[in-house]
């Protein structure tokens, strides 16, 4: 069954759903971010369709033409581009007789520039585009997406009421526990506001868990473009230290490549893939990472898509049925 193209395509779409790639189609972008394209090519829906095709091709190449390992979705340096995407994301190289694309209808495999430090799905432009605002990155959207969906960490609880005086002060980069305190910074960038969220309650409890996952991605802008300075022209430092209860608790890392390598070593990616596939199989999101049923499947898989799919389908909680006509 796994050799059937339709089955492979369905599993590819499950993976795209794991990363919420479909959210890309509800996003708008500041047109200044696509100024490298000719006026005729500056078609946001067209670019989004290109990015979706690119990511489908990437996932398919890893899972069915490559190693088949889930971990490689996070570490591969491959990207698929047509002429428009190659223009929008410059520096991609081609090898093995592959030439740069010359049309928007043909996608070819290329390799990201090593200097950009990209790493698999987390730096595919479609993923970054999906989890960003029109003109700036969203540390909250990216961080929550990685925490909840990519790493399958247990829910953090309900969001705080941002209309409260203490929350307003935090969002103004001001210590809410000190009467008459002045702002800690100019508070005019995503990073500076994130600093305050991770420092002061009532925001700290959740954002100290979420924001670090996004801050390692700060070198990649709202459309997945590589950059070395942020929206205010300040140098980017993608170094973070992960707090207790994170799978990487106590670890200090710089950049997304070191981040994904640490995730691979921890086993959390394979673990989350089981949870995501099982959620799809039973038609209901499994919110808790560690359960007896899911943990049993985790011990049986070898990290490949074929093993993952087979072991989830054979799990007792998937095969068991109650009620209905036999």
Model-predicted segments: where are they?
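Gly/Ser/Thr-rich helix-start
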Residues: 284
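Active-site substrate-binding loop specific to GH73 endo-beta-N-acetylglucosaminidase modules
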Residues: 1-281, 291-326
């Amino acid at each position: 069954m796994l050799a059937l193209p339709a089955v492979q395509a369905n599993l590819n779409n499950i993976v795209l759903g794991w990363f919420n790639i479909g959210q890309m189609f509800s996003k708008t972008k500041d047109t200044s971010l696509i100024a490298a394209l000719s006026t005729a090519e500056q078609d946001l829906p067209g670019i989004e369709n290109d990015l979706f095709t690119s990511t489908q091709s990437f996932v398919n190449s890893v899972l069915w033409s490559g190693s088949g390992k889930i971990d490689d979705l996070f570490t591969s340096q491959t990207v698929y581009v047509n002429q428009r995407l190659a223009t929008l994301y410059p520096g991609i190289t081609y090898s093995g007789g592959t030439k740069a694309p010359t049309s928007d209808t043909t996608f070819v495999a290329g390799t990201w520039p090593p200097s950009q430090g990209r790493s698999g799905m987390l730096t595919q432009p479609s993923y970054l585009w999906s989890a960003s605002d029109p003109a700036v990155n969203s540390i909250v959207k990216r961080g929550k997406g990685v925490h909840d969906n990519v790493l399958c960490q247990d829910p953090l609880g309900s969001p705080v009421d941002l209309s409260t005086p203490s929350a307003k002060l935090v969002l103004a980069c001001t210590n809410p526990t000190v009467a008459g305190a002045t702002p800690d910074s100019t508070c005019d960038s995503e990073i500076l506001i994130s600093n305050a969220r991770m420092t002061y309650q009532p925001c700290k409890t959740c954002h100290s868990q979420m924001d670090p996952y996004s801050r390692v991605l700060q070198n990649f802008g709202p459309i997945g473009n590589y950059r070395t300075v942020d929206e205010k022209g300040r140098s980017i430092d993608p170094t973070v230290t992960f707090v207790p209860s994170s799978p990487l608790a106590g670890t200090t890392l710089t950049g997304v490549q070191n981040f994904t390598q640490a995730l691979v070593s921890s086993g959390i990616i394979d673990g989350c893939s089981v949870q995501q596939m099982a959620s799809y199989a039973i038609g209901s999101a499994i919110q808790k990472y560690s359960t007896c049923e899911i943990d049993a499947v985790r011990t049986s898989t070898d990290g490949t898509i074929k093993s993952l799919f087979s072991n989830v389908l054979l799990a007792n909680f998937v095969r068991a049925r109650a009620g209905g006509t036999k």
